[in-house]
């Protein structure tokens, strides 16, 4: 018996050592990959605390010699008599309203495709999927012509109103989630006299909350970082979003205030981080459970 126990012990220890080595290598790779991904953000934040001469003379350093908040003060002062809080309010208004419109309209369309039978449902669903393959840049010129004739240029209307007509990606995401709901819930509600609208608001919406929050996070993030759409339709600085305002700190004809650019770019990430951390649980749940059925 002692010989058997002695022979097994080295094998058991050897396997344990292999597991430890494998775990150490795995965590080393994960930590290294995470550091490579967040390094640009760390460098940007560190540069926002450096003086103008130190930003480019100590590129690889993440620790400023003498930390200063002067870049934040200069950046928050804005330009043209408009402080940076105006641009924050514009971006917050744009992202919030656009997110509400995109999520609400997409949920309605997704419910119709998933639970309501109507003539041409398959055809229109195919058309919707085809729009995912169409680059947004292809529609820029015709959309600009239409919005120009409607006198919507230099207003938030071209940025907001199209969001209330749904988003193909969100529709598909919510549709797969709704398809996973038992049909018995709808049938029981119909027996109790509940209409399709009542079923949607009282039963479906509460059950697809993870999918709604997932779509809302994506919509807010995409809208918050959107640069091209505001660049095309907004001309007055008082209407600028954060992305346009940060671009304005860069002037090819004069000295670029890189410190202010890095400082305001760092501040612009705060709302995105807060929303992601607050709703991370719903985001993971919404992505992992979407498409399990249907």
Which residues are covered by each model-predicted region?
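Short, Lys/Arg-rich, polar N-terminal cytosolic tail immediately upstream
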Residues: 1-18
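A structural signal for multi-pass alpha-helical bundles of membrane permease subunits
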Residues: 4-7, 22-294
């Amino acid at each position: 018996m002692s010989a058997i126990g002695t022979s097994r012990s080295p094998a058991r220890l050897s396997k344990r050592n292999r597991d430890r080595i494998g775990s150490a290598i795995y965590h080393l790779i994960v930590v290294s990959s995470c550091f490579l991904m967040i390094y640009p953000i760390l460098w940007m934040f560190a540069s926002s605390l450096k003086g103008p001469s130190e930003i480019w003379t100590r590129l690889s350093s993440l620790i400023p010699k003498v930390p200063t908040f002067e870049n934040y003060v200069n950046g928050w002062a804005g330009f043209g008599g408009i402080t940076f809080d105006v641009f924050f309010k514009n971006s917050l208004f744009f992202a919030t309203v656009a997110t509400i419109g995109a999520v609400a309209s997409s949920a309605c369309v997704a419910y119709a495709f998933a639970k309501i039978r109507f003539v041409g449902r398959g055809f229109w669903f195919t058309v919707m999927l085809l729009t995912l393959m169409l680059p947004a840049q292809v529609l820029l010129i015709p959309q600009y012509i239409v919005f120009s004739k409607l006198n919507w240029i230099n207003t938030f209307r071209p940025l907001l109103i199209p969001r209330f007509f749904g988003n193909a990606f969100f529709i598909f995401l919510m549709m797969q989630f709704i398809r996973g709901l038992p049909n018995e819930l709808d049938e029981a509600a119909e027996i109790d006299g509940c209409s399709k609208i009542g079923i949607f608001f009282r039963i479906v919406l509460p059950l697809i909350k993870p999918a709604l929050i997932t779509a809302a996070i994506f919509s807010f993030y995409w809208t918050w970082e959107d640069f091209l759409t505001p660049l095309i339709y907004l001309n007055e600085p008082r209407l600028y979003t954060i992305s346009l305002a940060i671009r304005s700190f860069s002037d090819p004809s004069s000295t670029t205030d890189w410190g202010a650019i890095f400082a305001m770019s760092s501040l612009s990430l705060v709302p995105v981080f807060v929303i992601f951390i607050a709703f991370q649980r719903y985001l993971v749940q919404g992505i992992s459970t979407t498409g399990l059925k249907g």
